Structure formats: C-alpha cells, structure tokens
C-alpha cells in the first residue's frame, strides 16, 4: 500500500519506535495512527492519502519509546456526522472530522480535551499517555491512560467518559477505590492516597446490547515492590465490568492478588459465546502475561471453569508481604511454561547453552509466582511472557479462540535504594530493570518454542492445537520467535498474523494450525491486521502495519502493507 514518512519525532535516539497501529475502515477510507500520534486517512483500495493531522505530541516522562495503537470512530445517530477520536502521548483527547481530518472546534478547546486536568495536575513531569484507542458507547468516548510504574505516587489511573460532541466529563471510575466505595478496604491504612497505577493502558471492550464496558486493569505502582501497599490492592489486576452510560460498577474479578511481578491485564477482553452445560452463555475471556486464559460468565463475572487458589512462594525482601495464594484456572491449561529447570536450558548452539547454563545456576527460582528477591531471580514467565496487548480473535462457529504467546522469562533482583529514594527497594539487573532471560543474540535461554500460536476451544477448555510461530533463519529447527501483535480470523477459516521478529506475515488453517502462506515484509509487524472488502472493487484486503522496532529492536520501516488476491 505504501509507506508513511518517518519524521524526526517518530522515534527515539535508536530509531526503535514500534508501529503498532491497527487501522479502521469507514466508508472506503482507512484511518490509522503513527507512533508520534499523527492520524492519517487513506483510500482503502489504493493507499492514496486523503488527509493527515499532526497533534505535535511531545514526550512526558521516562517512557522507552513512542508507541500508539490506533484511533476510534463515532457516528451520529442520524448518520450525518462522523468523528475520529484518539488520545496522545502528552495526555490529550482529540476529535477530528472524519471527512476532513480537521479538529472539531466544539469538542473541548478547539478539538482537544486536556486529560491531565484533574488527575495529573500535581505531577507536571510525570507520564500520562494514551497509547490505545478509546472506546465508544452511544455518545460517550471512554478512555484510560498509561501512568508511571515508578515511583508509587503519581497521576491517577482512573477511567473517564466524555461527551463525544462537547468533550465535557460525564463520569469517572476510580480504579483505586476511595473511602466508601467497593474495594476500598483492600488497601491498608492510607496506601490508596496519591497512588498511581491500577490504570487501563490497554484496549477496552463494549457489550453494546447490555450497555456494559469491560476494563482490563493494570498493576498498582510500584509494580515490583508492594511494601507500601499491603493488601489485595483492588481493582488492580482485575477485569472490571461497568455500566457504560454511568460508570457504575457491575462486577469485578481479580486475577493477580497484590501484584509484584508486573503481571497487569495487558489484553483487550474478548466477548465470546460458550456452549457450557448444554446452553449458550455470554462470556468474556481475559488473556494474561502468566499464560492463563480466564473465561468468565459475562453477566456475573464468575469463572465458567474451576479456578483454584494455590499457595505461592514468599518474598525475602524486607517489608514485603506477598499474598499467600494466587488464582490458577484448571481450564484452559496455561499456554506457556510457568517453571524452569536445568533440563529446559536451550541446546541449539554450544555458545548459547554455555551462556544460559551459567546464568541459570546463578539465579534463584521457586516456580510460578516466585517474587523478585534480594538475589538475582528468574521469574517464569516474565513481563513479556504469555499474551500481551494484541489479545485474541474468536470464531463463534467452532468456539476457537486464537492466541499468540511468548515463552519469555525475566531476570532481576530487588536492590536497596538510597535513604531519600521514593521506595526502599527497586528491581534492577545488569541489563536494566526489564532484563530478559536470553543470550547475546536475544535467543531465549529455554528450549524452543519461544513463541506459539494456539487454538483454545472455549467450550471444552482444551487447547486444540499449538504451533511454533515464526522462526530464526540461521537456525534449522522450528523455534518460533518472541512476538507482539495479534491475530484475525476470517469466515473462510484463515488466521492471519504478523507479530514475529522475522519480518513475515502468515496465514494458518483455523482448524489444524497448518501454515498455509507466508509473505515477506519490510520489517516485523508488531501490530494486529484488519480485513475488509473494497467499496468499489469488492475485493477482500488484509492490511497490517509493518514497522519493526519496539522491545525486540530489529530493522525499522514505515510500511503499511496491503494484501489481496489477484483480480
């Protein structure tokens, strides 16, 4: 389809800003966002530019790189007016005329609402960024934000709804409950005050029929040390259902108690139908970094398959009080390995085996939910393990949920801080705070596969098939690769996905997991594709952003790649 010029502010000094946007298509026009928050509209069949808007977004806070996952669309009930809405890196909510790309002047101030107002006023230098597209319900635009992970005090992670025409605030949901609200008792003493985190940085889902919105809530800050927030820390690490019109709580389900692993809820909740006990049940599936898939009754928030509270290891860090148990779904089984032994060390090359074995023997690890300790610790899976923001796709006819996951562990230790530091301990390692358990080639230290594509039957709770996703060209075995980006599934029974670090776009047989096709890209596609029918030609297109960069670095590009069958 073409390339988007990568301007000076698209990237940081290493030129690694990932192109994570999933386009939307409205009446033959494809609209997407760039890492620097530009919104661009193209003819969906030719790729010819129609308009673009640059909000001149600046960087606030220590985020590693620019990233943005897309825009959303609202249309008036009469069908006449349409708006493109999205958030920016510097904490603004923008409304554009969908036809012209010009700001809607009656929205907020000249088309912009200052999202920092009321939640980040006391922290002018702290991050408050919107990296995921907001949700739309009727005439409301609903958004969360990315907030600091360190220190523990900072901008609020509340979810807010604004009038889509005027930009006026309609409701606020306190993801960290205030006195008198449900869940406030889960915060001991005054730990809730000025607490940052417990935010919704990922993508929300709306059940239009019921008028509910589902929030995947992140970890409370600081992610790896909870001595100043003893308790279960609601609504962190929860799936929360709200009345979309009012923000009123319907139900919640917590998937990690007192998180000290950065196991926030990274993925958009998937609204599914489950055939359970002889009847169809409206359900919601929540993917996690732990590799678990929680399948809940959409009306009640109760699990449809058994979930067991199991004892987990304790922390040896002074002041830390780990929660004694964590929830383990019995079905579906975890999609990634959750422990590591010497037998799991990679043997692909002598050099990799030697490096990884030496590192392994220097680390502490006691199975799933091992806390980062005072000694260097191996945590399996790590912060980039399991599923991530790209979520899953669902085929209702088969009941299959298609999920790509990472087999990535993490390494770190809790290091004492200076007396005047915000917290007594902070996670660190020789490679920085977010070190992965991989060798000098960024090949994970465990035996392959390193990344997989999975089909989960939500009716039975069983994994139907699992295949390696991606490969390393210089290695002969099917390793799979680390991956970020999601799937789509078509009526024709194809699952499309990029995501891998080998710069390829693939199609799989939905029923068997057999790879049917692979196409080369200019760079890896760390995004989720879209498919649509051409308004004029009637041809089916599949489009994906292929920009590389991000956590896995590699070569970068600005390509938006469009695929279609020949005429």
Which functions belong to the PLM regions below?
Residues 1-31, 55-58, 376-384:
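Asp/Glu-centered strand-loop micro-motifs enriched in Gly/Pro and often flanked by an aromatic residue
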Residues 16-36, 63-92, 126-151, 158, ...:
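Repeat-blade elements of multi-bladed beta-propeller folds
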Residues 288, 311, 407-409:
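Glycine-rich beta-alpha junction loops
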Residues 326, 330-409, 418, 452:
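Long, low-complexity segments enriched in small/aliphatic residues
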């Amino acid at each position: 389809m073409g390339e988007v010029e990568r301007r000076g502010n698209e990237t940081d000094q290493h030129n690694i800003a990932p192109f994570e946007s999933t386009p939307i298509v409205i009446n033959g026009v494809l609209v997407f966002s760039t890492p620097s928050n530009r919104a661009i509209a193209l003819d969906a069949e030719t790729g010819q530019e129609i308009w673009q808007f640059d909000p001149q977004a600046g960087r606030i806070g220590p985020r590693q790189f620019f990233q943005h996952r897309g825009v959303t669309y609202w249309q008036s009930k009469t069908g006449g007016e349409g708006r493109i809405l999205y958030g920016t890196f510097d904490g603004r909510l923008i409304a554009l005329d969908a036809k012209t790309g010009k700001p809607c002047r009656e929205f907020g101030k000249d088309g912009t609402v200052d999202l920092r107002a009321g939640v980040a006023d006391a922290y002018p230098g702290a991050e408050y960024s919107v990296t995921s597209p907001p949700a739309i319900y009727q005439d409301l635009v609903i958004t969360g934000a990315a907030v600091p992970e360190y220190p523990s005090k900072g901008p609020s992670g509340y979810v807010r709804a604004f009038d889509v025409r005027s930009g006026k605030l309609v409701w606020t949901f306190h993801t960290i409950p205030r006195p008198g609200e449900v869940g406030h008792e889960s915060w001991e003493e005054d730990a809730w005050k000025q607490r940052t985190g417990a935010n919704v940085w990922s993508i929300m889902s709306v059940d239009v029929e019921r008028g509910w919105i589902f929030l995947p809530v992140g970890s409370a800050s600081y992610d790896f040390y909870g001595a100043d927030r003893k308790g279960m820390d609601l609504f962190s690490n929860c799936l929360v259902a709200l009345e979309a019109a009012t923000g009123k709580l319907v139900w919640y389900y917590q998937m990690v108690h007192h998180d000290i692993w950065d196991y926030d809820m990274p993925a958009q909740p998937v609204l599914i139908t489950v055939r359970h006990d002889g009847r169809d049940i409206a359900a919601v599936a929540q993917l996690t970094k732990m590799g678990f898939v929680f399948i809940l009754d959409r009306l009640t928030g109760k699990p449809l398959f058994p979930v067991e509270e199991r004892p987990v290891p304790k922390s040896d860090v002074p002041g830390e009080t780990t929660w004694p148990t964590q929830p383990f779904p019995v079905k579906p089984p975890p999609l990634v390995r959750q422990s590591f032994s010497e037998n799991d060390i990679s043997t692909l090359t002598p050099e990799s085996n030697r490096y990884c074995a030496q590192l392994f023997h220097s680390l502490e690890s006691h199975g799933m939910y091992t806390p980062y300790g005072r000694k260097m610790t191996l945590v399996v899976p790590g912060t980039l393990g399991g599923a991530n923001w790209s979520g899953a796709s669902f085929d209702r006819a088969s009941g299959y949920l298609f999920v790509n996951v990472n087999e990535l562990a993490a390494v770190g230790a809790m290091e004492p801080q200076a007396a005047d530091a915000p917290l007594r301990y902070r996670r660190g390692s020789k490679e920085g705070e977010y070190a992965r358990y991989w060798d000098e080639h960024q090949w994970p230290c465990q035996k392959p596969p390193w990344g997989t594509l999975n089909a989960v039957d939500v009716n039975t709770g069983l994994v139907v098939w699992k295949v390696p996703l991606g490969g390393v060209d210089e290695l002969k075995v099917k390793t799979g690769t680390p991956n970020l980006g999601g799937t789509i599934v078509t009526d024709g029974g194809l699952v499309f996905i990029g995501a891998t670090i080998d710069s390829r776009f693939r199609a799989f047989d939905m029923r068997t997991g057999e790879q049917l096709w692979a196409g080369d890209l200019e760079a890896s596609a760390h995004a989720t594709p879209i498919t649509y029918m051409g308004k004029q030609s009637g041809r089916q297109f599949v489009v994906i952003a292929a920009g590389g960069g991000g956590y896995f670095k590699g070569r970068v590009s600005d390509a938006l790649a469009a695929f279609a069958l020949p005429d």
